[in-house]
């Protein structure tokens, strides 16, 4: 059984440089209300650009591509997906929209992670959407000659559900204390989640839920 405790790792991350960056980010966050009011149109355009870039980058991680023109139309929900790749891009678009619009109401729980993963594949109808991996997997690298090297061995499939539950509980407990900055807790959660690698497909895209 894997247990997670964010506090020891968190304390090691509190270097002067990181503390300075956290302070600056929180200062800028306090000023953003004025920016939103004064530059609403510019902010809307930036959000749309960010959605397109996020969709492109996250799907490329999974080897999913389409043309720039098709990608833009899919993200803007102005066309119907034609291929399997486009179906998965459309699923990502909808999940990203759900998170963008309702992030305050999305708890870091196993059931919610599975729901978002299911929605990633709602257009393709993939049977593994919304289910944790059913077989063990490895993170491997293939060189130019076709030789594979195992770079990382994630948790076995049978340990995955309990590990995700444990990780989510540890994160909620850490946030609930109010003593640890979520700006550091979030990337720590994501790294542990990726190390579990809980899905047969779509793990790299699933970290966007946070």
Regions found by a protein language model. Give the residues of each.
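FIC/Doc superfamily catalytic core
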Residues: 1-210
